Curated annotation (Swiss-Prot):
It comes from Struthio camelus. The keyword Hydrolase does not apply. One of its GO terms (cellular component) is mitochondrial inner membrane. Coiled coil: none annotated. One of its GO terms (molecular function) is NADH dehydrogenase (ubiquinone) activity. This is NADH-ubiquinone oxidoreductase chain 5. It is a multi-pass membrane protein. Its main location: mitochondrion.
């Protein structure tokens, strides 16, 4: 009883602490927020959240559900239902820890910005929307969190709204996510009309769900988690401030799609078509994003494509019927991805906004803490043994090796893993080693604790998070006890091959001034020609067809046939028909009069 009371109290306290900076200014005009207050609030919420998470793990509880009804239709009751299970309780401290570090970094990065308090409030609301999504126990609450992260991402990506690129990127993010939202809304409509409920527990009992609502949910995850086909918004979102990129890519919006599939996984578990769709889509996404990252020169774009590649790996795990592993990768990925973005932000800020890695070099001596943490982050991303990424990434590739599913997906995933090592090492070498290629008057300084503390804190998380999480969670399925050495070491072998490939390419191209253009480098540089084809060609075709339809239907049909000209022609025809009758001869008029009388008499008698 005491344990339950402590759990409920500490969890409620965590949520109330988070809401305080938003609610207090509404109560009194004298209570004004500052970035420091908001950062301290998230820090306090993180330390408070450790208590319920620890109690939950060690009490052996499966789930705690609380709900109350909000009925605005007589047939469909929609409860405000919250579920504290393994996923939501572990995600809570991870998200708070990462957000605390990002907010502390933003106090330095955005110090000279006007309206900086509003920026921090937006980041906090972004986090709250994501936490609403994770603890939601029905599709209605999940949809509120889903749309919340969508609108907050739009506001944050377009924060520098004076720049046309930022506005375009924000619109792109919204439009691509609208496509995914169509799938979610249609699936929710099917669930409400067929099962008469949006409760996830009740939905999970449906053993044979048709493929169409499942494809709608997969489409929703494809849009939100930037899978192949709806991926261009993710690299474009780099136009926002770096703290936004760090929060968006680590623990909020982009993992919302994968989290949706983890939540509704009982529906997918028995449908092989849906699982195969997830597997193939994820394998294609992870390879395509890794291929695009190979030739990028913008440091933030490289990290953005690495996020897209890791999201593809999570989608592969959903396709393998292992949602717990996908969630484990979400948790470990949050630490090193946030750290990579904060390191890139520190470098960009120190170099007066320069993002091109070809104009960096030799930063190991100038920014030792930042570059050391950047190296740790890249090693964790590669899946280096005993760092955070290893505990999830290695397990995913082991499971893929041991599954009876499609070898094509396995080959694509292994190739993408190799490419991950290649572009990570390329970025590390070009940023940190070699001769310095930065202007000599650039003021470089990383002495402020607002930079060093969050980055080193996340570096510690990138080293220890995998071990801590896997030590406290038991796998839902028994892992294979024995397997061939080649299958066990496949992930590390392809990673080493990728590193060797990067070193060889670095040596080969060290003295080249202009690399030769070929079809493969052009494919990677132009992001697979996807943007010109999707944004230019298809838009031009749609606009031309729309113009033709409008001109033919409206101009020709309405104006010519049925509109003013049509009426004029009709009246002219009537006038021409009646004109010959008006001859001016008395005999004609008398004959017409007599004929009219005769017809009238015939009709009346």
């Amino acid at each position: 009883m005491e344990t339950t009371l402590l759990f409920n109290t500490s969890l409620l306290l965590t949520l109330m602490i988070l809401l305080t900076p938003i609610l207090l200014p509404l109560l009194s005009t004298k209570l004004q927020n500052t970035p420091l207050i908001i950062t301290t609030t998230v820090k306090m919420a993180f330390f408070t959240s450790i208590i319920p998470t620890t109690i939950f793990i060690y009490s052996g509880t499966e789930a705690i559900i609380s709900h109350w009804y909000w009925s605005f239709t007589p047939n469909l009751k929609i409860p405000l239902s919250f579920k504290m299970d393994q996923y939501s309780m572990l995600f809570l401290p991870v998200a708070l820890f990462v957000t605390w570090s990002i907010l502390q970094f933003a106090m330095w990065y955005m110090a000279s910005e006007p309206h900086v308090t509003k920026f921090f409030i937006y980041l906090l609301m972004f986090l709250i929307a994501m936490l609403t999504l994770t603890i939601a126990n029905n599709m209605f609450m999940l949809f509120i969190g889903w749309e919340g992260v969508g609108i907050m991402s739009f506001l944050l990506i377009s924060w520098w709204h004076g720049r046309a690129e930022a506005n375009t990127a924000a619109l792109q993010a919204v439009i691509y996510n609208r496509i995914g939202d169509v799938g979610l809304i249609l699936s929710m409509a099917w669930l409400a009309s067929t099962l008469n409920t949006w409760e996830i527990q009740q939905i999970s009992y449906e053993s044979q769900t048709p493929i169409l609502p499942l494809l709608g949910l997969i489409l929703a995850a494809t849009g939100k988690s930037a899978q192949f086909g709806l991926h261009p918004w993710l690299p474009a979102a780099m136009e926002g401030p770096t703290p936004v990129s760090a929060l968006l890519h680590s623990s909020t919006m982009v993992v919302a799609g994968i989290f949706l599939l983890v939540r509704i996984h009982p529906l997918l578990a028995n449908n092989q078509t849906a699982l195969t769709t997830c597997l193939c889509l994820g394998a294609l996404s992870t390879l395509f994003a890794a291929t695009c990252a190979l030739t990028q020169n913008d440091i933030k774009k490289i990290i953005a494509f690495s996020t897209s590649s890791q999201l593809g790996l999570m989608m592969v795990t959903i396709g393998l019927n292992l949602p717990q592993l996908a969630f484990l990768h979400i948790s470990t990925h949050a630490f090193f991805k946030a750290m990579l973005f904060l390191c890139s932000g520190s470098i960009i800020h120190s170099l007066a906004g320069e993002q091109d890695i070809r104009k960096m070099g030799g930063l190991q001596k100038l920014l030792p803490t930042t570059t050391s943490c950047l190296t740790i982050g890249n090693l964790a991303l590669m899946g280096t043994p005993f760092l955070a990424g290893f505990y999830s990434k290695d397990l995913i590739i082991e499971s893929l090796n041991n599954s009876y599913l499609n070898a094509w997906a396995l080959l694509l995933t292994l190739l993408a893993t190799s490419f991950t090592a290649t572009y990570s090492l390329r970025m590390t070498l070009m940023v940190q080693s070699g001769f310095s290629r930065i202007p000599p008057i650039t003021p470089i300084n990383e002495n402020t604790p607002l930079v060093i503390n969050p980055i080193t804190r996340l570096a510690l998380g990138s080293i220890m998070a995998g071990l801590l999480i896997t030590s406290n969670i038991l796998p839902t399925k028994t892992p294979p006890m024995t397997m061939p050495t080649i299958m066990k070491t496949a992930a590390i072998v392809v990673t080493i091959l990728g590193i060797l490939l990067a070193l060889e390419l670095s040596n080969m191209t060290h003295n080249l001034t202009a690399p030769k253009q070929n079809i493969y480098s052009n494919f990677s540089t132009t992001l697979g020609y996807f943007n010109p084809l999707a944004h230019r060609l298809s838009s031009m075709k749609l606009l031309n067809n729309g113009q033709k339809i409008a001109s033919h239907l409206i101009d020709l049909s309405w104006y010519k046939k049925m509109g003013p000209e049509g009426l004029a022609d009709l009246q002219l025809m009537a006038a021409k028909t009646s004109t010959p009758l008006h001859t001016g001869l008395i005999k004609t008029y008398l004959g017409t009069f007599a004929l009219s009388i005769l017809i009238l008499l015939t009709l009346t008698h």
